[in-house]
Amino acid sequence: MMDGVFPRDVLIRPVADNDRPTVAWLTTQLWGATEVVVHDDAFHPADLPGFIAERAGRIAGLVTFEVRSGVMEIVTINALNLYQGIGTLLIEAVRAEAKRLGCHEVMLTTTNDNIGALRFYQRRGFRLAALRPGAVDRSRQHKPEIPRTGDFGIPLRDEIDLSCPV
């Protein structure tokens, strides 16, 4: 589903138990804490299943997810270097795992300011599924380190769900 060529030198592998400290560290670096709050739920990505993208023995990306009632929810996804196909490879790994587990849908949540993510996911077959006005404001009560202003100076207030059938 990607325009262009997949990087051939990237290994996608499941998160292993010995990766958990690294996942916790990366989560803190990328998300500001070891905990992520989405749709009023708190998640600890280091405790979740996921996939690591490696290039030349170094981490190039990470995705974590949770499965509930036949829906695989992406909790975090990060490509450490953009526009190199890492995010797409991680999405494809999640889709394959969702299919293997018998899930009928993959979903995720992003924020109203994350224009790049909205473009990325929709180009990969995800559709807008729900809008939660004020959800980030509520999450900030639990996790005050969430900034008030996001990408492009846009006030960070709302959550947007996207979903894709498996």
In which residue ranges do the predicted regions lie?
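Conserved N-terminal entry element of GNAT/NAT acetyltransferase domains
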Residues: 1-18, 160, 166
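Acetyl-CoA-dependent GNAT
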Residues: 14-84, 88-92, 157, 165
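Conserved beta-strand-loop-alpha-helix junction that forms the acyl-donor binding cleft
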Residues: 79, 108-117, 129, 133-140
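Short, P/G- and charge-enriched loop/turn segments at secondary-structure junctions
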Residues: 38-40, 145-153
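Conserved active-site tyrosine of GNAT-family acetyltransferases
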Residues: 121, 126
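Conserved GNAT acetyl-CoA-binding A-motif
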Residues: 98-110
